């Protein structure tokens, strides 16, 4: 599967170290630590760079195995969730990549797995090649807190991306508590947009402020009438009380203004959501934006009651690093 046929990449990377994901157990990391697999940045090659163990590699690399068995790394996800797909990335590992890999999962309500933990197969053994992405869709609705990456028998992995939907028990949410309903860690999803030439829409919902301009949503320069937009499904329906539109790092390419529309969309109607969104009610009337600035809107919001989806409109084009929608979830 290539990147163009891996739609699950629009989901949150649950193994991202920035979410708090950690390697809690590893069979071997002689040449390079397993923690490097979880770094957010793309792997790099450093020509002629060596350390005490050998050639410096941007990823996890084990020594050559001289006995039976295989290597493995156990990862505690920063956010537990349901997997939609994985990318086992072997970029820059050639001649030292594993021929195959598999993935297991478990759910630990507290703590980390031990010798008595029961593991379930998430991804059966798949063939790996050197210096390339390996995308695999996952069709399993069980949530996981930990994953175990098995490589056969040894070798190096540059990055492990685990795309999925964060798991949250909304029944345990304290009634009346406000939180960011659009945040990816709360189940928010970027569904569609007019353009994402320079930066994907999924970046809008990432935790924390953007690392750089590439860590936001940015459209191409519009040469035709109209404006750009992105549609977001909230992690849970709720009443929005505050909106934050952050243009951090966007200076000569920020939108002149923005507005937000919203609606409560019944289950099963997301397939037609782009056309429907044109007629959604106005949550935030058009507001001027500034470059490299975090804009917070409260009094400007219209009281619409519970909504499940929003449409961020930017005029006419440009970049937004983050969108936050704070509100109180509509609980059973």
UniProtKB/Swiss-Prot annotation:
UniProt-listed Enzyme Commission number(s): 3.5.3.4
Keyword Metal-binding attributed: no
Entry keyword annotation includes Cell membrane: no
Residues of the signal peptide: none
InterPro entries registered for this protein in UniProt: Allantoicase, Allantoicase_dom, Galactose-bd-like_sf
GO function terms (MF aspect): allantoicase activity
GO BP, sorted A to Z: allantoin catabolic process; purine nucleobase metabolic process
UniProt record similarity statement: Belongs to the allantoicase family.
The protein's name: Probable allantoicase
Native organism: Pseudomonas paraeruginosa (strain DSM 24068 / PA7)
């Amino acid at each position: 599967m290539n990147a163009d046929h891996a739609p699950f990449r629009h989901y949150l990377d649950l193994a991202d170290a920035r979410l708090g994901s950690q390697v809690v157990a590893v069979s071997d990391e002689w040449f390079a630590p397993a923690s490097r697999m979880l770094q957010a940045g793309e792997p790099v090659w450093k020509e002629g760079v060596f350390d005490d163990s050998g050639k410096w590699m941007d990823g996890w690399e084990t020594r050559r195995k001289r006995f039976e068995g295989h290597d493995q790394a156990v990862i505690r996800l920063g956010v537990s969730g349901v997997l939609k797909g994985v990318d086992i990335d072997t970029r820059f590992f050639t001649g030292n990549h594993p021929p195959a890999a598999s993935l297991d999962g478990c759910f630990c309500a507290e703590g980390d797995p031990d010798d008595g933990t029961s593991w379930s197969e998430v991804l059966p053994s798949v063939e790996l090649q050197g210096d390339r992405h390996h995308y695999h869709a996952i069709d399993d609705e069980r949530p996981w807190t930990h994953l175990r990456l098995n490589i056969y028998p040894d070798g190096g992995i540059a990055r492990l991306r685990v795309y999925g939907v964060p798991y949250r028990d909304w029944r345990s949410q304290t009634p009346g508590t406000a939180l960011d309903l659009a945040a990816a860690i709360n189940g928010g999803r970027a569904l569609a947009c007019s353009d994402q030439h320079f930066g994907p829409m999924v970046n809008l919902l990432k935790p924390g402020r953007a690392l750089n301009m590439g860590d936001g949503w940015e459209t191409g320069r519009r040469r035709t009438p109209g404006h750009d937009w992105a549609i977001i499904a909230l992690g849970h329906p709720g009443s929005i009380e505050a909106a934050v539109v952050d243009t951090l790092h966007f200076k000569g390419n920020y939108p002149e203004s923005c507005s937000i529309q919203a609606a409560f969309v019944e289950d099963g109607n997301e397939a037609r959501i782009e056309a429907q969104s044109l007629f959604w009610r106005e949550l935030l009337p058009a507001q001027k934006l500034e470059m490299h600035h975090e804009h917070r809107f409260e009094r400007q919001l219209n009281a619409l009651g519970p909504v499940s989806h929003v449409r961020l409109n930017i005029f006419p084009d440009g970049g937004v690093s983050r969108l936050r929608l704070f509100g109180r979830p509509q609980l059973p």
